[in-house]
Amino acid sequence: MASKASFSPEEWTKVLQSVMMAGIAVTAAEPSGLWGTLKESMVAGHALLEAKSDTKSSELIKAVVADFETSEGRAAARDRLQATLTGSKPGEVKAKAVAAVRDAAALLDAKAPDEAAAFKAWLRHISQAVAEASTEGGFLGFGGVRVSEAEKATLAEISGALGVKG
């Protein structure tokens, strides 16, 4: 069983960051305005709550959730996120987020091979939930689509980065 102790502090921060980057990649693919962006960001937080109460969550997922419950864990993930994205142009954010997810997937495969598949499926689930959080296009939520073409393409990129089926 992999745990936080299976990773160096730098590696663990990459694992934590991947949870946020999985959602940021989708949000950056097609910004949804203020309300849509708020809904999409809330979904990632909700995924942490779901995983905490899900008895089927892997020990590694539970360790990540536990770290996000501490101010130190949140600060480490936030600081890494800022270091990765600060100074990025809007068009670069998605590419950097997908790259961070890809790096985390490789790290998980190397350090936690028994739990990597479940963790990567969880990251993909977060991405899908973010994509479905708000409608794209239309007016006041009418006439839009649940997942835009840009978001579908990004979900495919994330699936490829994770090595999972979308």
What function would you assign to each model-found segment?
Residues 1-166:
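Small-residue-enriched hydrophobic alpha-helices in membranes
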